[in-house]
Curated annotation (Swiss-Prot):
The keyword Protein transport does not apply. One of its GO terms (molecular function) is alpha-1,4-glucan glucosyltransferase (UDP-glucose donor) activity. The keyword Transferase applies. It catalyses: [(1->4)-alpha-D-glucosyl](n) + ADP-alpha-D-glucose = [(1->4)-alpha-D-glucosyl](n+1) + ADP + H(+). This is Glycogen synthase. The lineage of its organism: Bacteria, Pseudomonadati, Pseudomonadota, Gammaproteobacteria, Enterobacterales. Pathway: Glycan biosynthesis; glycogen biosynthesis. InterPro entries: Glyco_trans_1, GS/SS, Starch_synth_cat_dom. One of its GO terms (biological process) is glycogen biosynthetic process. Pfam families: Glyco_transf_5, Glycos_transf_1.
Length: 477
């Protein structure tokens, strides 16, 4: 079986979010399962530099201009690159300029990605043709539409990593992207009077997956579906919507092998984690105190991630003797709020604005609790890293967070199921109650250690996900 992933980023070549982590790990896991898997990406500068052995496959004139299709390898995975400097050779973000404005030609840049994905199933590379084309998020959303226009030369899977980003463009761009105007209607890619790349993926794909079973259920409800609930409910009834949980790349996230940690450890040497905490406290300007539970945030600072709730609950966390270490960037109001808290509570609150992959490992290895209070969370990887590192996740019961973290309730503790702390309602009071439960468990060190070991024992490997995708592909064939 031959599978092509169509997407816009891949860790470690280029990363703006969790999508990159998935594409950095899933194809390799599928190859290990015996599936001939390759990836198609735009040749953004960082990606182009990283694929050093790229050779020309073919050149084509397209609706978006002249392109060269390249093929090379990265970390043992075959990579196709769409080399179109006039579209992709731009510094910084792949999606917007330095003023955070979306590029005005994004409609062409990402329509081309979908078009090439479809053409691969029609022999664009004469030596390799996919049986399944697996597109990810709105950037690749037109892929199933182009396949449908082509008479479906391959089966298509569309994975929703985040339904909030819908890839909306003016309707007149139908003239620019070489799809029939008949596709522009409510039973197609039209949404609220515009073209939606996301809806194209949802409507035309043979099967839709969400990145967790709970999120797959949630997106059939209005509060999570951003207007797509009717279509998603229909796909659910047709048996064409399912949830497959993301995994963790053990090669990158593993406390016993993590070279970015001052001190490596495993579930049998958890006492070594204390040195990581000490060094993290020093690095973040916090008081060195092994008795104070260290809560951490590694996140985009947005209301979706519930970081306003953390700011609201922070006085209660500090009053009980806790510390906070935060790494992230985003909403300027939230950034200012956390910086002000750090200034007001020196030694108790440490804040680094920005994102540094290496430092996120040090936080995960040194903190006691990782906070993930999201209003919605399709899968979430942060809590999975927390589980791996014995850094107990404190999460809201939504999406993938609900599927992966079990609350330290008395029943779960008695049954050996507890792996963290879970709260229900998206408000600061509910969050504070969970923080209070974390302090109660912290006051019982042997019980805390027991829950850490339970957490570290969980298996969220990519092999599990790769096997689930293989079963799905086989059902479609």
């Amino acid at each position: 079986m031959q599978v092509l992933h169509v997407c816009s980023e891949m860790f470690p070549l280029l990363k703006t979010g969790g999508l990159a982590d998935v594409i950095g790990a899933l194809p390799a896991a599928q190859i290990a399962e015996g599936i001939d898997t390759r990836v198609l990406l735009p040749a953004f500068p960082d990606i182009r530099r990283g694929v050093v052995d790229a050779q020309v496959v073919t050149r084509r004139d397209t609706f978006a201009g002249r392109i060269t299709l390249l093929y090379g390898h990265f970390n043992g995975v075959g990579i196709y690159l769409i080399d179109a400097p006039h579209l992709y050779d731009r510094p910084g973000s792949p999606y917007h300029d330095t003023n955070q404005h979306a590029y005005t030609d994004n409609v062409l840049r990402f329509a081309l990605l979908g078009w090439v994905g479809s053409e691969m199933a029609s022999g664009l590379d004469p030596f390799w043709r996919p049986d399944v084309v697996h597109a990810h998020d709105w950037h690749a959303g037109l892929t199933p539409a182009y396949l449908a226009a082509r008479g479906r030369p391959a089966k298509s899977v569309f994975t929703v990593h985040n339904l909030a980003y819908q890839g909306m463009f003016y309707s007149w761009h139908m003239n620019d992207i070489e799809l029939p105007w008949s596709f522009y209607n409510m039973h197609g890619l039209e949404f609220n009077g515009q073209i939606s790349f996301l809806k194209a993926g949802l409507y035309y794909a043979d099967h839709i997956t969400a990145v967790s079973p709970t999120y797959a259920r949630e997106i059939t409800e209005p509060q999570y579906a951003y207007g797509m609930e009717g279509l998603l409910r229909q796909r659910h009834h047709e048996g064409r919507l399912s949830g497959i949980l993301n995994g963790v790349d053990d090669g990158i996230w593993s406390p016993q092998n993590d070279l970015l940690l001052p001190m490596r450890y495993d579930r049998d040497t958890l006492e070594e984690k204390a040195e990581n905490k000490r060094q993290l406290q020093i690095a973040m300007g916090l008081k060195v105190d092994d008795k104070a539970p260290l809560f951490a945030v590694v996140s985009r600072l947005t209301s979706q991630k519930g970081l306003d709730l953390v700011l609201e609950a922070l006085p209660g966390l500090l009053e009980q003797g806790g510390q906070l270490a935060l790494l992230g960037a985003g909403d300027p109001v939230l950034q200012e709020g956390f910086l002000a808290a750090a200034a007001e509570h020196p030694g108790k609150v440490g804040v680094q604005i920005g994102y540094h992959e290496a430092f996120s490992h040090r936080i995960m290895g040194g903190a006691d609790v990782i906070l993930v209070p999201s209003r919605f969370e399709p899968c979430g990887l942060t809590q999975l890293y927390g589980l791996k590192y014995g850094t107990l996740p404190l999460v809201r019961r939504t999406g993938g967070l609900a599927d992966t973290v079990s609350d330290s309730s008395l029943e779960n503790l008695a049954d050996g199921l507890a792996t963290g702390f879970v709260f229900e309602d998206s408000n600061a009071l509910s969050l504070l109650r969970a923080i209070r439960r974390a302090f109660v468990l912290w006051s019982r060190p042997s019980l805390w250690r027991y829950v850490q070991r339970q957490a570290m024992n969980m298996d969220f490997s990519w092999q599990v996900a790769a096997n689930s995708y293989r079963e799905l592909y086989q059902r479609l064939m």
